[in-house]
Amino acid sequence: MAHRPRWTLSQVAELFEKPLLDLLFEAQQVHRQHFDPRQVQVSTLLSIKTGACPEDCKYCPQSSRYKTGLEAERLMEVEQVLESARKAKAAGSTRFCMGAAWKNPNERDMPYLEQMVQGVKDLGLEACMTLGTLSESQAQRLANAGLDYYNHNLDTSPEFYGNIITTRTYQERLDTLEKVRDAGIKVCSGGIVGLGETVKDRAGLLLQLANLPTPPESVPINMLVKVKGTPLADNDDVDAFDFIRTIAVARIMMPTSYVRLSAGREQMNEQTQAMCFMAGANSIFYGCKLLTTPNPEEDKDLQLFRKLGLNPQQTAVLAGDNEQQQRLEQALMTPDTDEYYNAAAL
């Protein structure tokens, strides 16, 4: 592997200080060198075990420490999960992500998790999980089951992290990413904008991600979804341009990674989302629920794709199976579908 120079904090700070339009121009140039600028990878996320999490992440409604009105649910049955995966595939998703509100998986649950991964793979979808910290053996078992991606976010900079979470150390998160990588699973890791962090903290987060031995293949950038009952419910709103700037810097620093618009997208208007795509975002979560917070309605996403001339990406594992790609393309082009957008009619 060719030597990859490490980023410094001062270099990242310079990117954040660039005039926004110059930054967007640079990010779009980088993006076009490595990706088709009209393609967006589409994922669906399902909460397979909701609530009653023992951790104290101040942004999260799934923590048992906060009264958010969220009802705790046990681990879903394997067939329930696979039925959701079938629906996701029919709706056009190419990756199915399964999330559980745990500090770490219990050994007794591993056989069920392995069956979920195998079942999702059998459907021709990429499989992703986010289950908390993992042991080496758990990471290897998931890899053997066929897991493509494992999500484990760093959330924020090492310096600000202690203000948000105390029940899991930053090093534990880095250790889990290393175990996942060593097991041969691709890494999905990003963070949250709007926790009360400074621009320097945003730079610090991206610095950590970009300077990993191998940068994450997927980098979700979340906008804080403020949930009543959590300690961050009254945080200030994130300025749209600040969020777009973070997307652009992530694209420049990690040119071959997928940069995903994740939680908080329902708070963005179409113009903000369009600028995020211009800044280099090329992945979204598609569906009605993003774990326990709202996600834009599917049809609205397809309409936005149509307006911007974007296409849902077809994943390599689906060679010879074009069902969902054809469904999306047909919906975008057919006048009598809800997804159809006709600019001439406006």
From Swiss-Prot:
What's the Enzyme Commission number for this chain? 2.8.1.6
Q: Where does [2Fe-2S] cluster bind?
A: C97, C128, C188, R260
| Residue intervals of the Radical SAM core domain | 38-256
Annotated positions binding [4Fe-4S] cluster: C53, C57, C60
Output the SMART domains linked to this UniProt entry: BATS (SM00876), Elp3 (SM00729)
Q: Give the family from UniProt.
A: Belongs to the radical SAM superfamily. Biotin synthase family.
Q: What is this protein called?
A: Biotin synthase
Q: Which organism is it from?
A: Shigella boydii serotype 18 (strain CDC 3083-94 / BS512)
